[in-house]
């Protein structure tokens, strides 16, 4: 009986949450900007207001979106980059900035010069 309860709880947990492939480019940009600006303010000591930071980052993602749409698979690559960046920075924030940012993971997904998102942060 315990095994059945365990299996049901695991299945229930597996069914929850969002499917990352169903989240739009704009939603990923919003998430990435939120986490990036929070991380900069809390972990890096940025003096830039989080709202101003958000506006700048979102504007940059909006500027590159048409360029990404023109190249086959580019938009998907940028969304993957935003997802990985969000995961990495969230892990750092969750540890109260004690966990170092896995820049190698971000670079692997985004490129060292942020090529995956056409230079957007």
Feature map (PLM): residue ranges:
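Signals and flexible motifs at protein termini associated with secretion
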Residues: 1-121
